[in-house]
């Protein structure tokens, strides 16, 4: 399925139904009182986070979404029925913002989460509402209120634990295919990956994490060059970044250290918070480096790159070194999950007190 991570839609909640002017007509009762009912409220527009969806492509082809208006009030004290609501299914991780102002409105972060993106208008009052001791036969009524109308921008940020960074052709797609259930397109030319790929890496029973592979970055990406800048937002919710470096480029004039520094510079320009995320260095394609040269080449790279973080030497093609990397990633992600879900510290002044009920 084609991955679409941005869409624009127009939503319109239903208008409220109008109130009714009506009077009782009974035999032998010349002046029956008012019995005009209120109009029904207009339908709401909801959005629900559906874990079975991973793209916004459907909203590219159906831009306008309208709920039904409420029914008008009727005589005999009959109120109008509420208009039918509509629910739009969106992938988990969708950000909903105002298309005109850019204001962030909602984030759908948990499966099944429901938000009201446009409220239906209230129904108008029938003349029954205006009866008083002074006015026994009111002929007033009010129209229904209009429903909310909004132009919205939908933006999808994938919810992955680990994000892959690197130049085009660094071997990110080969790595994600080697360690996960993802099957991205792989070829020996740059820009093979044109949209994000998600893969679930299973470490053991009930032990897994999600990896996101985005199109490769090039110099100037933060200003819009290449493809990767469009998808950098997907890395903002990850717990860990893997910086994948091609240690055996086809073009011998290409310096892996210069490429790696360019990636880090683009990351810093794009988003400081993203730049400060935990980041590990993954030196790939070492199977193409003569065995006697590997240690010296890795040492030289780390020294010139001035890297002080974790370093992993792998070959995604032969899967050499992938298993220790996967185990280390899981331990890191699992530790962060435990820290995030840890119970809040109890104030010692209230420790041991029975719950009040």
Curated annotation (Swiss-Prot):
Q: Which domain of life is it from?
A: Bacteria
Tell me the compartments it is located in.
Cytoplasm
GO cellular component term of the entry, any? cytoplasm
- Give the residues the record marks as binding Mg(2+): 173, 193
State where it is primarily located: cytoplasm
Function comment: An essential GTPase which binds GTP, GDP and possibly (p)ppGpp with moderate affinity, with high nucleotide exchange rates and a fairly low GTP hydrolysis rate. Plays a role in control of the cell cycle, stress response, ribosome biogenesis and in those bacteria that undergo differentiation, in morphogenesis control.
Q: Could you tell me what this protein is called?
A: GTPase Obg
Q: Which organism is it from?
A: Acidovorax sp. (strain JS42)
Biological classification of the source = Bacteria, Pseudomonadati, Pseudomonadota, Betaproteobacteria, Burkholderiales
What is the primary gene name for this protein? obg
